[in-house]
Every structure is written in structure tokens, then in C-alpha cells.
Amino acid sequence: KRIKDQLADEAMRSAVDGVAWHCYGPAEEATNMLEVAALHPDVPFYHTENGPHVVISERTEWWWAAKVFNMIQCGCSLFTSWNLCLDELGTPMTGAHLCGGFAIVDSATQEVSYSPQYNLFRHIGPFVKRGARVLEAEGFRDGTRLILFRNPDGEHVLVVACDGSLVRKIQRRRIVVKYKGLYKTLPLPGGQWSVSTLLFR
């Protein structure tokens, strides 16, 4: 409501280049942006602050897939993390929250490890090019999350996150993609989460 009111003010609108969103609620609340996008389709949206939790299990790759996919599908042209590099305890502390690092440096061994958010970003960033469009992808079902991009050169990038649950006790999930009249099947790992990136030309 606040953003709609501000953009309705002509003087304010003339000074605004875009809207920075912080999605602190559930991933599904990203749909709140759609009403603003419908009223102001020329205003860019950016997701500018959301980072890992110091307890890795609090925000898994599956958790991040819901957050990142929904924010982008609802209009954000970028998704920014928060702390680039912290130790395993989330220090140096930047506030009262239990923030983790995008990358984590072990304070004893100096070994570098990577957060679940980093792992998900690695399935998007290297493949989705500047100027890509987000396309509607049909076929969502329980246990999978999808997002589909088309790069400026015509290449399509499909990112699939799976929670690892089995369709039946002995049957793994699979993704069947129809592209240019041909069907391609991708079996997904069973019993564990996974993120897969498929490229189509």
C-alpha cells in the first residue's frame, strides 16, 4: 500500500527509478508485487536484501528456490544477497539477526565453504544473461519448483528444484520437457534435494 501511494504522487514518481523490495515474509507473499506491477509496468523492481541464515538447515536450497523463483517471477529483475563473507558463527556481527555468509570462512582452518543460497545462485547466474526474459512455465507439482528464462540469443534456461521426495516408494521424480516438438526427460535424484539447470537452443 505504501508503495502504491508513493508512486501515485506525480512528484515522487518523477524521482523514482525503481522499487527495492525486501521479502522478509513467506515466499508466497511475493505476489503482493503484482498489483503494483500492473499499475506501474514501467517501474523496475529489485530484490535488494536477503541472505543466508547462520544455521544452514534453516534456509536450504529448496527454501531459497521458493524465495528467489517467486520474487523473479513476480517482477524483480535481480535478487541480491546480504553478507558476502562471514565466519561459521556469522561474525563479524552486523545486527541482531542470525545472518550467515554467502560464503563461509572457517575461523580455525580458513577453509571456504558455500551457503545453500550460493549453490542455488550457481544454477542461475552463469546461465541467465543480461536482458533475459522470464517466461511462464507450466507443470508445477508438489515437490518441484521451476523457473524458465529466455536469453537474448534465444537460448532457454530452465532451473528445476526438487525436494527429493519420491512419487512412489520406488519411483523417482522426473521432468519431461517439450521443446520444438521434441520431448526430453530428466530423472531427478530420489531421496535428496536437487537443483538442475537445463539449456535449450
Show which residues each predicted segment covers.
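Sec/Tat-exported extracytoplasmic proteins
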Residues: 10, 23, 75, 83, ...
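Carbohydrate-binding surface patches
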Residues: 127, 136-182, 193
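Noncatalytic carbohydrate-binding groove/subsite architecture in carbohydrate-active enzymes
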Residues: 1-67
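C-terminal beta-strand-rich structural cap/linker in extracellular carbohydrate-active enzymes
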Residues: 188-201
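Extended hydrophobic-aromatic, low-complexity segments
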Residues: 29-30, 90-92, 167-171
